[in-house]
Regions:
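Conserved amphipathic alpha-helical interaction elements at protein-protein interfaces in regulatory
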Residues: 31, 35, 59, 63, ...
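A ubiquitous structural signal for well-ordered alpha-helices
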Residues: 25, 32, 56, 111, ...
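Hydrophobic helical membrane-anchoring modules
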Residues: 2-6, 185-324
Length: 324
């Protein structure tokens, strides 16, 4: 809570090489926050940018001390950067936004209004995504459907990481301390009073995406994490497939016996054997792969490495870097 007893909103931006966007982002966020009676802080988490992004932030900090900067020691990715921002936020509520201005700052007032109505988590749902190609939208829609089918919680379709989270809900999320958290799923998992706000997502303001849909591994990892974080269904798939293959094998065996005994079918042992071997081999590899994903998550957790390492901080009461 700020010293003037106003409620405080913490806005968190993770970024990588966004020199073409940051100034416009700051201008629009400041304008939006001037329309509400709240104090605020702007936490920019720098994922080891190599362009002029940091210089732009430092220049803006000279006139606006609400701007705070966290510099990572190397590139850790979006999720660790957001977690770092969450842990450093002092606001009564936090909002994480993409730094590319695809999430328009102008709808912050709508999120705040829902928060004022008593909601602890305010999701944003994209009704339209400008600048996105049909293939990406189609694959994304299918991925959401699959995750929804196997997940133990309801993850809203077309809802990303852009959402408002109250201090109460945020503390619950941070207590989980998962090694590879799915940030768009955890707010739904912790519960509390939740709602959603619809908006049209803009095209990127400038520059190119740092997460190309086809060449980047991030979308695939997010999809796998979306399934494994809130569901054990994949572990049972091998059981169900094993049953189906066994049942199918029995039916096929009976079919072969009938064909040979009553219709004089020629010897097909080798072809039948090869089909059975290939099918069972594929199922075994599939089952091992699924279990490997879960074991890999356990292995990663047992390493007990920090999720991120901070090189330096500016604007915080405690500017030491031992928090990770």
């Amino acid at each position: 809570m700020s010293l003037n007893n106003k409620r405080t909103l913490s806005l968190i931006f993770s970024f990588l090489n966004e020199e073409e966007v940051l100034q416009e982002l700051i201008n629009r966020v400041e304008k939006s926050m001037s329309e509400v009676n709240y104090d605020y802080e702007l936490i920019f988490v720098n994922d080891a940018s190599t362009d002029k992004s940091l210089s732009i932030l430092e220049e803006n900090r000279k006139r606006n001390q609400r701007i705070k900067i966290i510099n990572m020691s190397r590139r850790f990715g979006i999720t660790p950067c957001v977690i770092a921002g969450y842990k450093h936020a002092v606001g009564d509520a936090v909002v994480h936004m993409d730094s590319d201005l695809q999430d328009p700052p102008e709808i912050l007032t709508k999120l705040i209004k829902k928060w004022e109505e008593g909601y602890d988590v305010v999701h944003t749902v994209r009704t339209k995504r400008k600048g996105e190609n049909f293939f990406k939208m189609f694959v994304t829609k299918i991925a959401y459907k699959i995750i929804a089918a196997v997940s133990s919680i309801k993850i809203l379709e077309n809802s990303g990481d852009f959402k408002l989270i109250s201090r109460k809900a945020l503390e619950s999320i941070l207590k989980l301390d998962e090694d590879e958290p799915l940030l768009r799923g955890l707010p739904a998992w912790v519960g509390y009073k939740q709602t959603k706000v619809y908006y049209e997502r803009d095209a990127r303001f400038a520059g190119k995406s740092h997460v190309p849909f086809l060449s980047s591994s991030k979308p695939r990892k997010e999809f796998i994490r979306g399934i494994t974080s809130f569901s054990s269904v994949p572990l049972y798939i091998s059981l169900y497939l094993g049953f189906l293959v066994s049942f199918g094998s029995i039916i096929y065996m009976l079919y072969i016996i009938v064909q040979k005994q009553f219709f004089g079918m020629q010897n097909t042992e080798w072809s039948s054997l090869m089909i059975a071997i290939l099918m069972l081999g594929g199922l075994i590899l599939f089952a091992i792969g699924i279990q490997g994903i879960y074991l890999g998550m356990v292995h990663q957790s047992l390493k007990n490495r920090p999720k991120y390492i901070i090189e330096s901080k500016k604007g915080f009461t405690n500017n030491t870097t031992n928090e990770n």
